[in-house]
């Protein structure tokens, strides 16, 4: 990792992006022991409006907490992918929720249907953000899976630990398949639905 690593988690209000940013920042800062800054913003609408959370990671104290040139962009809807992709570095990591993102600006993207997995596997769309965190922890070098799990379990309501742990692992499994496809084909196609659901 360089001295600074910039992450933007983006989508619409109601997708749990702010909580996701907080959990990711705590995983990196508390459990992995790096310097971290987390900020967030909402569109003028509440649920359904635009939402983003930024996490800046560094080996030293952070003097500017806003993301400018992204090392990692997670896009949970089409609008955020279109709007923020130009901010991604040429060698940056793009992860999209292919439930909603169908027009992808580069072949070098990891496509995982976070929301569809949440609906079909867990019958709860609310865990899509935790599935996305699991995928991010496997695809990005910036945070360990162990730190993410510890941060998630410290944040979620009592009694939902198993659900959230399973959601994390579902995200990791889906990301592993996407990564294997990338390695094999040098592009990352959508993971077939039947393969995704059979792997949890």
Regions picked out by a protein language model, each given a short descriptive name:
Residues 1-200:
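Active-site cofactor/cluster-binding pocket
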């Amino acid at each position: 990792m360089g001295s600074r690593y910039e992450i933007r988690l983006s989508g619409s209000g109601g997708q749990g992006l702010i909580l996701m940013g907080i959990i990711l920042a705590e995983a990196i800062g508390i459990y992995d022991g790096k310097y971290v800054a987390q900020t967030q913003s909402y569109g003028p609408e509440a649920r359904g409006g635009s939402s983003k959370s930024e996490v800046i990671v560094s080996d030293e104290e952070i003097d500017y907490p806003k993301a400018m040139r992204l090392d990692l962009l997670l896009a949970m809807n089409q609008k955020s992918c279109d709007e923020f992709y130009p901010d991604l570095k040429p060698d940056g990591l793009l992860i999209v929720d292919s439930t909603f993102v169908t027009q992808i600006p580069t072949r070098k993207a990891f496509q995982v249907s976070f929301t569809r997995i949440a609906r079909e596997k867990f019958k709860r769309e609310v865990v899509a953000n935790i599935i996305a965190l699991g995928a991010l922890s496997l695809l990005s070098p910036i945070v360990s899976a162990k730190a993410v799990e510890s941060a998630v379990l410290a944040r979620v309501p009592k009694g939902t630990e198993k659900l959230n742990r399973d959601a994390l692992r579902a995200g990791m499994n889906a990301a592993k398949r996407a990564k294997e496809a990338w390695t094999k084909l040098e592009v990352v196609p959508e993971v077939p639905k039947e393969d995704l659901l059979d792997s949890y």
